[in-house]
């Protein structure tokens, strides 16, 4: 934290937070809620300043800024801590969760706690998961079975896991920048995209890929990371308040994202999109070898996998 002094001489600790989306995004709103509540609960001793829209740089560099003390917190993809500890691959593994609620229950159950604290040796800690929604496939035809994906070129993030996932699902993955997807679909360079309903609608991909099929291959976790210097600088009482508000903000974000998905679907349907609901088990079975490989890479990942499965059965 940096420190400011008010006109009446009180010290205010500034919590600097980086985020790559705009102020309308559910993740921004959840972080704003956390900051406002913490400021109120500490009688103004802490104030959160959020830098949205990626103004402080690429998400991949945020962990380094936090490690050096240039930032206190950030919302980043799970691939960022995975760069420090490969066990984080399990958190965003294909077909690990049934839906966003399953990911929420897993996060709040404490299933990730051991893994999340493991990065303290790198001077940052993962505090919680914020969802970025469920990723599904969209194309100019409905996708009901893995056979429907045969030979189709599907745009994915630049990730070995994503490329392998599409291969197991029956298609051919190709990495491509999000900004290029609309034109690539329009020109037939790719046959399909895969992302959340928000992205599908915000980028107007329904204009070039009418069918949005709920393959539900990824329930997307982003993570909130924080500097250990910032966390350790808090008193025990303030830290207890902060931890409670982090959990509250997790619930807030999942609820807000679910609401935004419904709005995105209505918008897409009004513009001619057709939502398709295949049997996801057909795709899950195809991807099971990939999930087994990721979940079996260490004792930590095995424990997390077992906890996730137990929570599935408790539903």
Predicted regions: what is each one?
Residues 105-123, 129:
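Hinge/lid segment of periplasmic solute-binding proteins
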Residues 1-100, 120-315:
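N-terminal secretory/targeting leader peptides
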